[in-house]
């Protein structure tokens, strides 16, 4: 997997001060995407163990609230297979930090609850979802763009609290 950039002090992609990883590779190709260069799976630099360690080190300070994944598309199967073991390391090394993930896929598609879904599902999808606290789901829709929304770009996108959703068996929206 490649990545395009790491932001070590981000306040736009989740609550508090965050470390943000922009992965490369996306098949959604949303009109108006703010990172179209990340559609290419080969764009950027190789995500390797040294990058993992750099991110873990960046997450250590107390003022960092958590990690955010976006891109590109973190839930493209080839990206999941790299991100899942990394997220396990994040949970082990930084158990008090939260993890947010932006995806153009809907929660129902990722969980397999939508009939005919499965394009993004692979052998690690469920386990990867279990490591994420908040999923911002849905493609960016230019016609629904709203710059006043908190932590999302278009009206159709949802901030889903995955922990509470799992507990209650239905989608529970995040509310800080």
Label for each model-derived stretch:
Residues 88-91, 100, 145-176:
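P-loop/Walker A phosphate-binding loop and immediately adjacent motor/lid segment at beta-alpha junctions
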Residues 1-3, 17, 35-115:
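Conserved Radical SAM active-site core
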Residues 53, 60, 114-144:
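Structural recognition of alpha->loop->beta junctions
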Residues 10, 57-58, 90, 123-126, ...:
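Short, flexible, glycine/charge-rich loop motifs used to bind or transfer phosphoryl groups or to couple energy/partner
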Residues 12, 108, 168:
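Flexible, glycine-rich phosphate/dinucleotide-binding loops
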Residues 2-29:
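N-terminal pre-triad scaffold of radical SAM enzymes
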Residues 74, 106-109, 135, 171-176:
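Conserved strand-turn element in the central/C-terminal portion of the radical SAM core barrel
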Residues 96, 131-132, 156:
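A generic structural signal for alpha->beta connector loops
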